[in-house]
C-alpha cells in the first residue's frame, strides 16, 4: 500500500525560479482548496503567501475559534480546518513560497510572470487570487498610550490561545461577530468579561446573540452598553483600568488587565490594486460563473472576490475554487477536452 507523506513541502527563504500551470496568491482556506481542485485536474500550482505559514486568518488570527458552518463538521477550529486542508493537498506536493508578497505581475493569459518580495520568479499560465483581506491589520482604537500596552500584550487584537486569558479580567470592545464569539469562547476561562459596545444592539449571528443574552443573564459576561472606549490606565505596560464613556460624556472605569478591541481588519490589496483589475470597495469583481476577473487568465476567489449575491463564507470560497479550477483547465490544455467526473470515480491522482 502506498504511503503518503503528510509533511508540507519545504518553503525555502532563498529566491526560486518556478515554472508552473497556476500561481495561487493566498494560502488561506480558499487558496488551499484551489490547490486541491487544480491537483485533481492534474494541474500544477504554487502557493504564495505573505504569512510564514499557510492558513490565512484561520491560522494567524483564530486557530482556536470554532467554525460552525463547514459541511459535515458541527464545529471545527480554524487550526483544525487548515490541518485537514493540508492533508487533502499533501498528495500533490505543491511548492509553497511563504513570507513573501507578490510585487509584480506581467504578461497575458497563458504566459504570466510574477516576482515576489524575496526575489522569486514564477512563470504561470493562469493566476488565482485568494488573498482574503489582502495584507490585513487591525483597526486600532485612538487611545493615548496605546502602543505601550500593545507592546506588553495587555492590548491584543487576535486570540491565538484561550488559555492565555485564564483568570484574567478582560474587556472586549466591539459589536460584531468576533466580539460576541470571543466573549462566549472565554467563558469559564477569564475571571471576568466585559463587553463594550457603543450601541445596545449587536451585529452577530442570531444564535450567538441568544447565547450572549443568556450569558449576560447568568452573570458570565457583563454588557457595557452604550459605551465606547475612552482611555487606558496603568504603568509600564501593565493595564489596570479601561475607561469607557457614553456619548453624553458619562465615564465608567472597568478594572481589567487585558483589552481585546475587535473593530475589524483594515484591507490593503497592496500591489494587486495596480494590476488593472476591476475593483469595488477594495474587492475584486468577477464573473461568478467562472470566477474570472476582467483580465483574462486572472481569477479571484474567497473573501477578496465580489459579485451580486456574494456571501463571505468559507464554503462559498470552496465552491469558487472548484469553478475557477475547471475554467483554468482549457487555458493550460487548450487542445484537451475536460470531461467532468466525480472524485468517487477518479480518486486522487497519484
Swiss-Prot record:
Catalytic activity entry: 2 reduced [2Fe-2S]-[ferredoxin] + NADP(+) + H(+) = 2 oxidized [2Fe-2S]-[ferredoxin] + NADPH
MF annotations from Gene Ontology: ferredoxin-NADP+ reductase activity; flavin adenine dinucleotide binding; NADP binding
Keyword Cell membrane applies: no
Class of the enzyme per the UniProt entry, highest EC level: oxidoreductase
Cofactor(s) required for function per UniProt: FAD
Cofactor binding remark: Binds 1 FAD per subunit.
Residue numbers binding FAD: 49, 57, 62, 102, 136, 303, 344
Enzyme Commission number, as recorded: 1.18.1.2
Gene3D superfamilies in the cross-refs: FAD/NAD(P)-binding domain
Keywords: FAD, Flavoprotein, NADP, Oxidoreductase
Assembly information from the UniProt record: Homodimer.
PANTHER family, alphabetized: THIOREDOXIN REDUCTASE 1-RELATED-RELATED (PTHR48105)
HAMAP family for the chain: FENR2 (MF_01685)
Family assignment from sequence similarity: Belongs to the ferredoxin--NADP reductase type 2 family.
Protein name: Ferredoxin--NADP reductase
